[in-house]
Amino acid sequence: MAIGLAVGMALPGAMVAQKPAVKNAANAALDPHIVSALKDVSPARVKATVEKLVSFGTRNTLSANDPELAKQGKGIVAAREWIKSEFERYAAACRGCLEVSYDQFTQAPGRRVPQPTDLANVYAILRGTDAEAAKHIYLVTGHYDSMPTSPTDGKSAAPGANDDASGTAVSLECARVLSKYKFPATIIFLAVAGEEQGLYGSAHFAKMAKEKGWQLDAVLNNDIVGGVKTAGQDASIVRVFSEGVPVSATEEQLRMLRNIGGESDSSSRQVARYVRETAKKYMAKGDFGPKLVFRRDRYLRGGDHTSFNEQGFAAVRFTEYREDYTHQHQDVRTENGIEYGDLVKFVDFDYVANVARLNAATLAQLASAPASPVNVTMVTEKLENDTTITWDASPDGRATAYEVVWRPTTAPEWENVEAVGDVRMAVLKRSKDNVVFGVRALDRQGHRSLPVVPQPKMRQATPPAATPAPSEKK
């Protein structure tokens, strides 16, 4: 279906001829730096990270209350010090390109926290090189705490190799390979504590990001990404969970979602689709990729991405395809011939490395792309079969062109894309009643932003005619 461009709002000389829509939006030139970074991801390094984290014996958040453990080089305090030292080592290798910090606080007694407990999130910031683009932040995280059968047992062995040394290894490996490059936007590499106690670490960090006014455009949470070696596992798939209706939506926003059928177009859902499109582009062999799951998380479970959702940020969760619950949240033991415990030997390090590559590719794509267009609007002032969409330029000033994407309302992914050039309006010969549209920005190298679904510009109601006062009636 062709698109006709309204050029009245375009930049001088910006005109694009009509041409047919293109199926599969992922067909674009590969960024050689991203390709190089993905080749640098090492299963051996991932394995070393997981083994080191397991060596601390327990990383239960409550082990912070046992000073003897820290003296022995065990427990969560020793673990977080080691994670910080790794970030600092990467920073030294890139001549100080990473800013390494603790987000430290005392968690008051509450659910699964029987006494005041010192928590610390560890993070490293790779600042963007463009003054405006650097305001846009993309974050990868995993939780480094662990637990045995009881979440309040801070003494027993809690190896947590899969849950979640694997996700922490993804965050660290992304930091190691991506810190060798420069990006216009900012990337944060994070490891959080307190997840097993009730998402306390991520909740504190997300709240801090909100209070500081960070423009956090996407959060990639990796939790249980070890590809545990068990019957029924599929090493070619990682699940990506995303919320549909935003938990932070206001009543007015919910009313709009109901009116336009926008239940599957939250910002988190757009991030999930972006991950999928990135996989098609950079993991094109087809031997590994994401399976999009359109719900916030699994049944009876929760994750750190939801802490960011609750603060209004787009966030998704990566999790292995099939979980083995004998190797999660279990005291290490053997019963009736069954080996329980989250042990290193059950982790598939090639699988974790693939998850790290997918995360790294997504982060690098996002941090290289121009910011998404703003004020994206669909004109709905009269009944018509054409669709008019308008938008304002990407705020970082780096976009050189825009694309309109669309899909049937029942389709999970964007199916069509049309280049419309450096314009601010497009008139599409396709009814808005039948499809979902999005607009995204791209730069000269073909890096594409997250798409933005247009909001309707509703018809202005005609005010009722004034009723004459009784004395004026004739």
Where are these regions (language model features)?
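A non-catalytic alpha/beta surface segment that caps or lines the substrate-entry region
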Residues: K23, R45-R127
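Active-site-adjacent mobile loop/cap segments within catalytic or ligand-binding domains
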Residues: V54, V225-P246, L292-P370
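Alpha-helical metal-binding/catalytic segments enriched in His/Glu/Asp
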Residues: A124, V140-L199, N359
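Metal-dependent peptidase/peptidase-like ectodomains
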Residues: V192-G303, Q311, A315
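Conserved aromatic anchor
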Residues: N385-R398
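Short beta-strand segments within Ig-like beta-sandwich modules, predominantly Fibronectin type-III
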Residues: N416-V423
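Beta-strand-rich modules
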Residues: V427-S449
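Extracellular fibronectin type III
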Residues: L442-K473
